[in-house]
């Protein structure tokens, strides 16, 4: 069984380098174009369903992809929402550094291990509902990064760009990475690195 994780298209807060987290920020026109492009890329394969985070930027991305592929409207799963960054949400890099310098704890920030746990629970449930099929899952950069660190902890993967695709296999009760930034046989999606948009993710990567 194959799961393809897709990061949503661009939002205004992405372009402003503000931390979004669970704050519901919609797609820009650029983000909708990225979603359509990803849908056309994914059309090279056959798919059974699309599942999404209920946050509007992910759900609209998923809806655009489903329309491109002629699939039913996406279903949603609350466990696929972005990491909660607590009081850092809405801050840009300078504001983050001023209010929470260095290793200062951010009140309300969700632990990465908790994000990975709920995300993997959701992905395993999706996989079990679609044995021997391929499903697209549209979510968020912080969540995808958390899954990658759990599934492939030794690797330091690159940019998780808006609209990018990352493929996984579910087999014998375990999830494994097939390809980071999967080219779907030809090309990868151009976009901006999550860590250039989100100062929390940038700071945590620097500690590794």
Regions found by a protein language model. Give the residues of each.
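Acidic, low-complexity terminal tails and accessory targeting/binding regions
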Residues: 71, 83-94, 149-208
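Short glycine/proline- and acidic residue-enriched helix-loop micro-motifs
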Residues: 97-114, 199-208
